[in-house]
């Protein structure tokens, strides 16, 4: 059978550098850092005392008090970002066939704050099991797409992909394939995460995964810099409306880009460390290109996973060298995590959005905070250091990798109106 074409017709973002798509792009294009000392709790005794929190987000601006209490922050973020994307796409919810609209969402952790607080309350009690009746439905990762579908009446496929930091990229690839195969007309996809909590910070600190640059929070996320010392935890959500091309054209939708391919692979190497030679990462990019029917030379821009970890950044660039060869020096490579921090399960969504907006505006956002050259990194790479660069982008790639060796890659193509 002939596969259907899939396009992006709506975007929504709730990030540490902007609470809407417009604000997010302004932050990206100007090299804004979303990192600051933690305000959600007293982090004085933590090894890392900073994170990329949302700024000026008040749940009561979007939900009544009763509704807000029933939702963990990760689900609140999902509803807010998906609403923006649905509105941006101009979907007519009164006439659309809701049996052919799905919600496929990504969350690596889900309701961590809810889980943490309920366990603390129980531990501080007398052993009597007094739990909030909303404990489980607030915590489970699948509640985010469930609530999106309940709010809008979408009755197509509805589930959450859980693959650590690759979660929302996997969700997008599933959404792509459902539409390509003709099973849906529209899918709301993306991801959300809210792990800036005592448990989140403490857990990642125990793994020695986070930067401890407490004297310079804004400069802590520094992908590809020789002095990088771990990732910075972020939070938020990204939402994309994926739609069958002819369906989008028929209703006169504005099209941001075409989703032309998705690839997945596994490192099969270690629980948390990447394969040092980037074998799984090499394979996922090759799989994505093959799925799209495109050549390495077609790619103009790569938004890397680029977490600012000593091992991960080098392994990814090794893989890029293997896949793209001499063409690698022609590609604008960046890591927007230098600005947003690492949104875990939402990373693939917000970074895909960054790639799509870079394509739209012909401007590649910078990799900020770079000051010391890493001798293990080929100097011929254009890592878009410290300042945005103008670039005509016809094809953009977004890489996302997760603990457990999960690798996902999504490819977007500019589509002429």
Kindly give the residue locations of the regions a language model identified.
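ACP-dependent fatty acid/polyketide chain-elongation machinery
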Residues: 1-67, 246-256, 353-368, 413-417
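Flexible, low-complexity linker/loop segments at domain and module junctions
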Residues: 1-8, 97-98, 292-298, 329, ...
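Condensing-enzyme catalytic core mediating Claisen C-C bond formation in acyl metabolism
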Residues: 5-9, 36, 215-292, 301, ...
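Conserved beta-ketoacyl condensing-enzyme motif
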Residues: 8, 23-24, 29-163, 192-201, ...
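A glycine- and small-aliphatic-rich helix-loop capping segment at beta-alpha/alpha-beta transitions
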Residues: 22-27, 113-128, 178-181, 201-214, ...
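Active-site-proximal alpha-helical scaffold in enzymes
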Residues: 78-91, 144-145, 149-152, 158-193, ...
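Glycine-/small-residue-rich "gating" segment that lines the acyl/pantetheine channel
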Residues: 125-132, 173, 177, 193-250, ...
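Acyl-CoA/ACP chain-elongation machinery
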Residues: 183-229, 262-276, 306-313, 330-381
């Amino acid at each position: 059978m002939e596969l259907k074409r899939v396009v992006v017709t709506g975007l929504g973002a709730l990030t540490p550098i902007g609470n809407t798509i417009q604000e997010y792009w302004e932050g990206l294009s100007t090299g804004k850092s979303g990192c600051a000392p933690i305000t959600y709790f007293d982090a004085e005794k933590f090894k890392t005392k900073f994170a990329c929190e949302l700024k000026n987000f008040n749940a009561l601006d979007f939900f009544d008090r009763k509704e807000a209490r029933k939702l963990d922050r990760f689900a609140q973020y999902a509803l807010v970002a998906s609403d923006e994307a649905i509105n941006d796409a101009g979907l007519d919810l009164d006439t659309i066939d809701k049996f052919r609209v799905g919600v496929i969402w990504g969350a690596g952790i889900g309701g961590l704050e809810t889980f943490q607080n309920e366990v603390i309350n129980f531990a501080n009690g007398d052993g009597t099991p007094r739990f909030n009746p909303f404990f489980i439905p607030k915590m489970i990762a699948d509640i985010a797409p469930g609530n999106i579908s309940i709010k809008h009446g979408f009755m197509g496929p509805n589930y959450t992909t859980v693959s650590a930091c690759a979660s929302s990229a996997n969700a997008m690839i599933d959404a792509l394939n459902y539409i390509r195969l003709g099973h849906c007309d529209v899918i709301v996809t993306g991801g959300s995460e809210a792990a800036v909590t005592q448990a989140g910070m403490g857990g990642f600190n125990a793994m020695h995964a986070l930067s401890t640059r407490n004297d310079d929070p804004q400069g802590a996320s520094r992908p590809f810099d020789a002095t990088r010392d771990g990732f910075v935890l972020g939070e938020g959500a990204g939402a994309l409306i994926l739609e069958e091309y002819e369906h989008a054209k028929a209703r006169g939708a504005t099209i941001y880009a075409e989703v032309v391919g998705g690839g997945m692979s596994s490192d099969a190497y270690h629980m948390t460390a990447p394969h040092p030679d980037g074998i799984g990462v090499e394979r996922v990019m090759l799989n994505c290109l093959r799925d799209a029917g495109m050549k390495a030379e077609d790619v103009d821009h790569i938004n890397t996973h680029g977490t600012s970890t000593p091992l991960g950044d080098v392994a990814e660039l090794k893989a890029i060298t293997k896949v793209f060869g001499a063409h690698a020096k022609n590609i604008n490579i960046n890591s927007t995590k230098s600005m947003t921090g690492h949104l875990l399960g939402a990373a693939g969504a917000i970074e895909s959005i960054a790639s799509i907006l870079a394509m739209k505006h012909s401007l590649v956002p910078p990799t900020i905070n770079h000051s010391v050259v890493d001798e293990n990194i080929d100097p011929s790479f254009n890592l878009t250091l410290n300042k945005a660069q103008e670039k005509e982008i016809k094809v953009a790639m977004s890489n996302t990798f997760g603990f457990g060796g999960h690798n996902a890659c999504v490819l977007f193509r500019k589509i002429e109106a």
